[in-house]
Amino acid sequence: MKALVSGIVDLSTIDYPKKASAVIFLYGCNMKCPYCHNLKFMLEHKRGMTVEEIFNDIDFLFADAIVISGGEPTLQKDAVIEIARYAKEKGFPVKIDTNGTHPEVIEELIKNKLIDYVAIDVKCRFDKYKEFVKCREDGEEIKNKILKIIDLCKKNNVFVECRTTFVPKVMDEEDIEDIAKTVKDCDLYAIQQFEPKDAYDEEFKKLPMPKENELRELGKIAKKYIDNVVIRTINGTFEI
């Protein structure tokens, strides 16, 4: 079988915490986040590749982990499972980035011991989902799916991170507090700095980038509910 691939990064030091990773970006997404920095690139780049071709395309001189990202990689269930299996056979830890809408794919990865790290993008407060990311499911349905993934990970010793890109004038402190309360059982919660220049939506390019001290204050709010909280900025990752 062939996976639809948008791009491959041979070496990243930010996508898998504390590891140097190769990142495989799978084509396709079921959301349209206005701040997304991958969407335009993904829509313009697509090629069919076998798993062997994908791994032959990666220079493993420095990478010691594999990240499967997107788009939304779980839309290509068979490809995700085959890539993860191939990576594990080669001895690599595997991380997947997901919006949480397909817990059944994560469940199969966990059941077959093909995944070590799950990072879930929590886009906004769940009651704002339909409006904010233009998805089919309502926020309550997505919330339940995300909570199912967190529960699966916790029961099977798979590290689970939740993360939110904080967009000023669209989100506020109450949003972060509501999200943190909801995903309080995750192993790590990351608040990420919005970068307007990379936004897919032209209107979002006009919004300000949140200041680091603002993110730190938001991190303190999240810390009331979650032990491990970090902020991710253009200057690096910082524990709260």
UniProtKB/Swiss-Prot annotation:
Residue numbers binding S-adenosyl-L-methionine: Y35, C36, H37, G71, F126, D127, K128
Origin superkingdom: Archaea
CDD domains assigned: Radical_SAM
Key word Chaperone present: no
All copies of domain Radical SAM core, residue ranges: 14-232
Pfam family, one: Radical_SAM
Catalysed reactions, semicolon-separated: glycyl-[protein] + reduced [flavodoxin] + S-adenosyl-L-methionine = glycin-2-yl radical-[protein] + semiquinone [flavodoxin] + 5'-deoxyadenosine + L-methionine + H(+)
Residue positions binding [4Fe-4S] cluster: C29, C33, C36
Signal peptide: none
Cofactor note: Binds 1 [4Fe-4S] cluster. The cluster is coordinated with 3 cysteines and an exchangeable S-adenosyl-L-methionine.
Family, similarity comment: Belongs to the organic radical-activating enzymes family.
Cofactor(s) recorded in Swiss-Prot or TrEMBL: [4Fe-4S] cluster
InterPro entries: Aldolase_TIM (IPR013785), NrdG2 (IPR012840), Radical_activat_CS (IPR001989), Radical_SAM_PqqE_MftC-like (IPR050377), rSAM (IPR007197)
EC id: 1.97.1.-
Organism taxonomic ancestry: Archaea, Methanobacteriati, Methanobacteriota, Methanomada group, Methanococci
Top enzyme class: oxidoreductase
GO molecular function terms noted in the UniProt entry: 4 iron, 4 sulfur cluster binding; metal ion binding; oxidoreductase activity
Record-given protein name: Putative glycyl-radical enzyme activating enzyme MJ1227
Keywords, in A-Z order: 4Fe-4S, Iron, Iron-sulfur, Metal-binding, Oxidoreductase, S-adenosyl-L-methionine
